[in-house]
Regions:
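Short, well-ordered coil/turn residues at beta-beta hairpins
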Residues: 6, 86-89, 161
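Short acidic, glycine-rich loop/turn motifs
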Residues: 60-61, 161-163
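Extreme N-terminal starter segment of soluble prokaryotic enzymes
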Residues: 1-4
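Conserved N-proximal alpha/beta basic substrate-recognition cap immediately N-terminal to
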Residues: 11-142, 146
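N-terminal cationic-hydrophobic initiation segments that often serve targeting/anchoring roles
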Residues: 28, 105, 151, 188-189
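A broad, low-specificity signal for short, low-complexity segments enriched in glycine/proline
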Residues: 41-51, 74-76, 118-121, 158-160, ...
Length: 246
């Protein structure tokens, strides 16, 4: 059994909080051969047939449980020979990210988690548009006039980039913020002039937010993320803590 983990540099992940590390560790403990690749290493080789290949490096665990791989010893493989490919790299969700999904779309045999087509077609922060009845008042836009109108109506809001992660760029702003228009222009420019997400500020945020894990539509587990004192962010990367929940 061979698993490929497409991810950021394994040597830089925090083994105490990174879920990718836990997936790799458990796979290795079960005797599965695990490999690492950077999404930039994937390529299409077309000559009568189309082969999707990548350079990969085999993963192992050191005695201190840190992940180990040899960056200088890379092996070129046909990705059809993998049993499963885990797409685990962090955003930005940009053209490099999207181009990689086009290549992975061509694979027939490996199980790809999560499906590359679905990752591309349903960016996680846009999925809420399918559930408006469960979503607080929200605006997704890069139009300054529309954003200011929304902020003035809702008084206090949370703003965040549409394609970020780990709490990056999340801020609370008020309708009476000084130089609001200039702030918004600079904020949008900082995040590649892409649309941003603005939501009405929910005052019960201290209770945390619940992440639910579904497998084929069935609930497999859940965790409550609670922000630390004096913070509005419940993201684990931003200091949020995990609390047991039903």
């Amino acid at each position: 059994m061979k698993f490929l983990f497409q991810m950021d540099d394994p040597k830089k992940i925090n083994i105490n909080e990174d879920s990718t590390y836990m997936l790799i560790k458990e796979s290795l403990n079960r005797g599965i051969d695990c490999y690492y690749n950077d999404p930039r290493w994937v390529f299409s080789e077309i000559n009568k047939v189309n082969k999707i290949k990548s350079h990969v490096s085999r993963l192992s665990l050191k005695k201190n449980n840190q992940l180990s791989y040899q960056r200088k010893i890379l092996k070129e493989i046909d990705l059809e020979h993998m049993n499963a490919i885990f797409i685990r790299q962090d955003p930005p969700f940009d053209l490099n990210y999207i181009s990689n999904t086009y290549l992975l779309d061509q694979l027939k045999k490996p199980l790809i988690l999560n499906n590359s087509k679905e990752i591309r077609n349903f960016p996680e922060k846009h999925i809420m548009m399918n559930f408006p009845e469960l979503t607080p008042p929200t605006l997704i836009s890069s139009n300054i006039e529309a954003i200011i109108k929304f902020i003035k109506k809702n008084k206090e809001v949370i703003i965040k980039p549409a394609y970020g992660n780990g709490g990056l760029g999340i801020q609370k702003i008020s309708h009476n913020k000084t130089n609001l228009s200039t702030f918004l222009k600079n904020y949008i420019k900082k995040f590649s002039n892409c649309p941003v997400i603005i939501q009405r500020f929910l005052k019960n945020f201290k209770k945390g937010d619940k992440r639910i894990i579904l497998i084929n539509g069935d609930i497999a587990g859940a965790v409550l993320r609670v922000p630390r004192t004096n913070s509005i962010k419940a993201n684990f990367h931003a200091g949020g803590r995990a609390v047991e929940t039903n």
